[in-house]
Amino acid sequence: MKILVAHNRYLYRGGEDTVVDAEVNLLRQHGHQVWVYSRDNAEIQYLTPFEAAKTSLWSRQTAQELQKIHQQFSPDLIHAHNTFPLISPSIYGVAQKLRIPVVQTLHNFRLVYPQAMLLREGKHWEACVGKLPWRVVIHQCYRQSLSQTALTSTMLTLQRLKGVWDKQISLFIVLNQLCREIFARGGLPMDKLRIKPNFVESHREPQWQHRRGGLFIGRLSAEKGIDVLDSCDRCLLQRATAGLG
């Protein structure tokens, strides 16, 4: 199968970027032809605020580049990962025009909550999921910015009104059952939500005997629960830390 993988990379490499690279390698190992279309948030520094806002709603550059890729590669399927802000919803419109089915992996909750991580003032927050975004805008939930929250909410509202989720995306991939329920509550069609967890490539068999302690894998930041890790760490007699970044 010929697969076009589309991903908007973050300014600082994170879990989503790692997952995309791992999936591309896995697909190629199984004989699929994969073309990776990526844009990088580092590009934003060259845009004016108006240009950045306009691009997040509809990117002419993305639309033109996808048309060229179709002429060269003619993919059977588009697998979209993060599309915010530079790839933009234009990828869905182009795919529909070219009659290419789209599978969308939802790595975070941005489609139902602009802040993307279901957090407000550092605490878990689901009250705005599935409702009109006026509360989100008032509370400035995205980067504590009224303008940026309003822009992101506008993008999501336009997608909903245009029927993007129902008409232009064939299937959504979520990471677990809880995510599936939250996205369904947020308005995504339940029959299009499929569960596929992330994976780690390893050729070692896990050894369960004589193990002690715990393992934390993630970015050392507040939203990842670093306070919980710290409180648990105090109970351990020994600890080891390894990481990148």
Model-identified regions with their sequence ranges:
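Carbohydrate-associated surface elements
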Residues: 178, 199
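Short N-terminal targeting/anchoring amphipathic segment
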Residues: 5, 67-87, 101-110
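Glycosyltransferase donor-sugar binding loop
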Residues: 40-41, 217, 238-245
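A short, charged, and often flexible helix/loop element on the N-terminal side
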Residues: 39-68, 73, 80-82, 142-153
